[in-house]
UniProtKB/Swiss-Prot annotation:
Recorded family membership: Belongs to the YajC family.
Subunit and partners: Part of the SecDF-YidC-YajC translocase complex. The SecDF-YidC-YajC translocase forms a supercomplex with SecYEG, called the holo-translocon (HTL).
Region described as Disordered: spans on this chain: 96-115
BP-aspect Gene Ontology terms: protein transport
Any single GO CC term annotated in Swiss-Prot or TrEMBL for this entry: plasma membrane
Protein name: Sec translocon accessory complex subunit YajC
Gene name, Swiss-Prot/TrEMBL: yajC
Length: 115
């Protein structure tokens, strides 16, 4: 009986971990389902492989993505990771500007030894 009493807290802790892990997984799955249900043609998305594309058409389980002007490919809906928001485009432009500034500063600090 004593061994059972010592083992009971361990079981409760493990049960709690399992409950919270499954709850988090369920929430993530529901968020993915909600995203896939809310997609509309014309929106920009990221795929799970990192590709950025524009939605052209949506079917039950598939989605047509334009990856370059005039280039349309068909993907499973499950391959869509997230929607690209207009703020993301602004952030990318800001990062490019910052990279140029860093390159300019790095170029000014170069020291050459011309003897």
């Amino acid at each position: 009986m004593e061994s059972f009493v010592l083992f009971l807290p361990f079981l409760l802790i493990m049960g709690g971990f399992m409950y919270f892990a499954s709850r988090r997984q369920r929430r993530a799955m529901q968020a993915t389902i909600d995203l896939h249900d809310s997609l509309q043609p014309g929106e920009r998305v990221h795929t799970t492989s990192g590709l950025e594309a524009t939605i052209v058409a949506i079917a039950d389980d598939t989605i047509d993505l334009e990856i370059a002007p005039g280039v349309v490919t068909t993907w499973m809906k499950l391959a869509i990771r997230d929607r690209i928001l207009p703020d993301d485009d602004i952030d990318e432009e800001l990062n490019e500007d910052l990279d140029k500034d860093v390159d300019d500063v790095a170029g000014e600090r170069r020291v050459t030894n011309d003897s």
